[in-house]
Amino acid sequence: MCIRDSVGTGENGRIKRQDIENLITSENINSKTSSTPDTPKKNETSKPKDKDKSISRLRKRIAENMVLSKQTSAHVMTSVEVDYENVEIFRSKLKTKFKEENGFSLTYLPFISLATIYALSEFPTVNSSFDLENGTHDIHSHINLGVAVDLNQEGLLVGTIPEADSLNLKGLARKISETSKKLREGKFGLEEVTGSTFTISNNGSFNSFMTAPIINQPNVAILSTESVKKRPVVIQSQDGTDSIAIRHTGILSLTWDHRVFDGSIALLFLNYIKDKLENSDWLQGLE
């Protein structure tokens, strides 16, 4: 600050007290302004850009089928909880030997599939196709089981196991393994991905709790398997007393077409599967 540079406002240019105070104030403002660094401009080129990705033919087909199904069927979801302890005890005893002898794992899916086939035989309306425009409702004589297969997160295909009702537990396990392998490797024919009469989506393999799957047209229902976990449950002993036990449990979710049947059939169907899983003697299925 230089007082000599100040212009006095008093008589004959004399510097007054107010002139000095004004000069001090002016210097402080200039000092603050000069000491404040310029804010650097944001580098616009460093921002990540959106990626334009073309839709694959498979994804486009999946999208079309999903929208068509939601526009066609009256989707309703019903679920039950299953105690898998009966399955787990049997599976844990045999899974190591089974894989050594057959070259693939004995998972929960073949057990669920076989129980589902039993239920479809008992409730044939669930194993059908429905065409409202033409006024037809076809009850299928055979069970062609569709199994949804994830293609390593690149899409989804439904592999078909024709006449699955003619197979036992071991035969189903083998067919499911072979079909899944073919689809993932892209080594399949058209007949292996068409013609299903009922579909199972194995979401449990991805650690799901509950899923509402979309019906695979022209089926009238689809079953979603959910993850099997150890959970505390209340069990009743033979003398009628209750106790807490750790059991392998999981949810089964059925999405069904309310145009074709009602909730009573959906629940009877699901509880039939539940009963088979909880009480069947699985040993005969491997013979």
Locate each region found by the language model.
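C-terminal catalytic/motor cores of large multi-domain enzyme assemblies
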Residues: 11-19, 23, 27-287
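Conserved small/polar residues in nucleotide/adenosyl-binding loops
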Residues: 1-5
